[in-house]
């Protein structure tokens, strides 16, 4: 009974440690999706034309994804950019 109890305590400690760990640290080696800015069409305006409308427009144009993004720098206006 002592071994079973020790194993259960160890299992619960490991489970607790995993659940409390920071997910960003666990996924720090993941690559972000990269896309070309060649297919940026509509200007994104908060409250009027956002990520949802951008995604719908891009899928209607035959792309898999669409996101509101700056073309080159943070100072540039945000456009709807489509990519696969």
Swiss-Prot record:
Disulfide bonds join 40-82, 44-68, 54-80, 58-81. InterPro entries: Defensin-like_dom (IPR056373). It is found in: Secreted. Residues 1-29 form the signal peptide. It holds the Pfam family Defensin. It comes from the Eukaryota. GO terms for cellular component: extracellular region. GO terms for biological process: defense response to fungus; killing of cells of another organism. Keywords: Antimicrobial, Disulfide bond, Fungicide, Plant defense, Secreted, Signal. The keyword Disulfide bond applies. Belongs to the DEFL family. This is Defensin-like protein 49.
């Amino acid at each position: 009974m002592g071994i079973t109890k020790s194993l259960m305590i160890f299992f619960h400690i490991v489970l607790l440690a995993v659940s409390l760990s920071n997910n960003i640290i666990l996924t720090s080696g993941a690559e972000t999706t990269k896309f070309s800015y060649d297919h940026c069409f509509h200007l994104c305006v908060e409250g009027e034309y956002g990520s949802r409308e951008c995604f719908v427009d891009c899928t209607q144009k035959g792309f898999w994804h669409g996101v509101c993004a700056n073309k080159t720098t943070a100072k540039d206006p945000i456009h709807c950019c489509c990519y696969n």
